[in-house]
Amino acid sequence: MGLVAVLIGVNVEARAAMSRGFNRLLESVVSINVRELAFESGARRYTSSLGSGVLMSEDGVVLTNAHVVGRRAVEINVTLSNLERVGARLVGWDHWTDLAVLRLDMDEVKRRGFKLAAARFGESEKLFPGQEVYAVGTPHGLTRTVTRGIVSNTNRYFEDTRGIGGYETGMFNTWLQTDAAINPGNSGGPLVTSDGKVVGISSRGYLGANNLGFAIPASTARVVLERLVQEGAVVRSYVGIVPGALQDLENFYALALNTGVLVSSVDPGSPAAKAGLRPGDILLSIDGARVDGRFPEQLPPIQNLIASRPIGSELRLSVKRGAETRDFPVVTERLESRVGEEWALEKWGLSVRRVSRTYARENQLEGSDGAVVIGVQPGFPGDVAGIARGDILLKVNQQSINSLDVLKQAHAAYEASPAPTLIETQRNRRVSLLIIKP
């Protein structure tokens, strides 16, 4: 009888500790309202979005999704667990992992006497399918909503996907899959275990399906959070190869199982292309570190192995091509998104985006000068001149557009004193001269 009493006492104490941990977690979950500048319509406009986040330190550091705060937030307000609203600023943003960090206005927090409760990370590496988890957030504006489910998969892989605004995400991590309900507004909120430890950051649901939600593992979030707080960005190296899983191809390439990874494509003009790598090569090792990409879930660690090297460093890629194995020295560049800086040239009725190096390579452009037209206002001078969405603006008044500042200055001059402006454009590889008239 005494043993039973002891066991019951231990169980009650454990449940109480778990309850305290979960209640503390609830105090750390916040709602995020963002007002963001957008340029897609050929003019400046403001959009509003709502998401969730979680306080990760008592000095006001909030972890959320990159797609919640966007790239051009002009106002961020965070609603705390006490329902009070506090201003915040963007500290850092990493669309590659869909994570962002905010910092609360701590002067305001202290002036108003608020006490902040910080959440703690759990070990996502130790999760197992069937384990109970909870998603906490603000679905459809309903604050501090808790939904319960299980871990459906601990290592879900998605091929490189395009997020909101066309930004790439998913190259450098796998995802936790859960059947806990994740709806619009949950994004950025924590996925937690029963003791309130954060094991993931809710990121997306699966359109048209039920009980399919996905979260960024804490193992990824912990590293990105630290880098964003310290440096404001996560800088990664790039060589220009896209790895592909070798599953079912080993016999074709006469390879032993679990040997190497397929080079499925090579970006034109990239360091790998300049070094001589080709699609169909088998990458065996990177600086002597053996790689194994038999399954898609094994690809993110290979991407991270390259991304973690210093920019400008030389990598030795050991490659099998046919019966021959040889080493290729490849010098890394800084990884860059295909989505460049955006701006609105309102008097002309044009929204533009800087041509990035990645965009230029994808579209086989000769260089990375220029700006892509992403929006045109009907009836405005740009539209009347014949400029269309998707055109690339190469020169303005015979000056190469090597940055958006060139276009901004020409537009400012037009705004101050309207005069005909000569624009050199490219459409389907055909270059034309157009005149924007007042």
Model-predicted segments: where are they?
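Active-site region of chymotrypsin-like
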Residues: 28, 40, 46, 105-120, ...
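Short, conserved beta-turn/loop elements at beta-strand boundaries and strand-helix junctions
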Residues: 58, 93-97, 154-160, 246-248, ...
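Short conserved beta-strand and strand-loop elements enriched in small hydrophobics
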Residues: 32, 74-82, 133-137, 313-321, ...
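Conserved active-site neighborhood of the chymotrypsin/trypsin-like protease fold
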Residues: 37-38, 55-145, 184, 208, ...
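N-terminal activation segment of mature serine protease catalytic domains
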Residues: 10-44, 48-52, 58-61, 65, ...
